[in-house]
């Protein structure tokens, strides 16, 4: 499993500033976005591909509100007119429309940069229901590979489907044993 770059739990502005000061590059567990671009279908599908690629790999964080150059964080860029609840609802609707199966466990963490200014960290867990496909004419199965996303190879896809079936079978066996042990 890949270690997270940002701390678990509440994320403070100091953690985001340390990404810049420490010259932390985008990688297997983190991606930087200066804005939340969901203005057109191409932008929505690109963001969905990022989410699915993290879920299909080891999970990770997408940080909205950090400018990057050459894959390295360069500056905090507060999100303009940020309404956390509205943005979360919009993003969840987009993800549920374009990713199958839905990615469980997404967390949206608002980070106050200054009075009235915010960034957003989208925490994507490694999914137990992977592989996740982008819905299109031909479904695509992206996976995070270092600081980029790429399509899953056929062998990897077979392995993930097999692992998913194995997890479902183990959960079913656990429930049967739990029910059998009840008085």
Predicted features along the sequence, with ranges:
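Conserved N-terminal catalytic/coupling substructures associated with nucleotide/phosphate chemistry
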Residues: 1-183
């Amino acid at each position: 499993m890949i270690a997270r770059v940002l701390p678990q739990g509440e994320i403070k502005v100091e953690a985001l500033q340390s990404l810049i000061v420490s010259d932390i590059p985008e990688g297997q567990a983190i991606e930087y976005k200066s804005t939340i671009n969901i203005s057109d279908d191409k932008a929505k599908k690109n963001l969905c591909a990022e989410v699915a690629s993290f879920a299909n790999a080891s999970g990770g964080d997408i940080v909205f509100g950090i400018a990057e150059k050459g894959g390295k964080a360069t500056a905090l860029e507060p999100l303009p007119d940020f309404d956390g609840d509205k943005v979360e609802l919009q993003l969840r609707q987009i993800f549920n429309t374009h990713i199958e199966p839905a990615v469980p466990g997404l967390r949206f963490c608002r980070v106050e940069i200054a009075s009235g200014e915010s960034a957003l960290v989208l925490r994507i867990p490694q999914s137990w229901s992977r592989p996740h496909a982008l819905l299109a004419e031909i479904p695509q199965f992206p996976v995070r590979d270092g600081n980029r996303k790429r399509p899953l190879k056929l062998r990897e896809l077979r392995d993930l489907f097999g692992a998913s079936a194995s997890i479902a079978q183990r959960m079913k066996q656990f429930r049967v044993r739990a029910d059998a042990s009840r008085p």
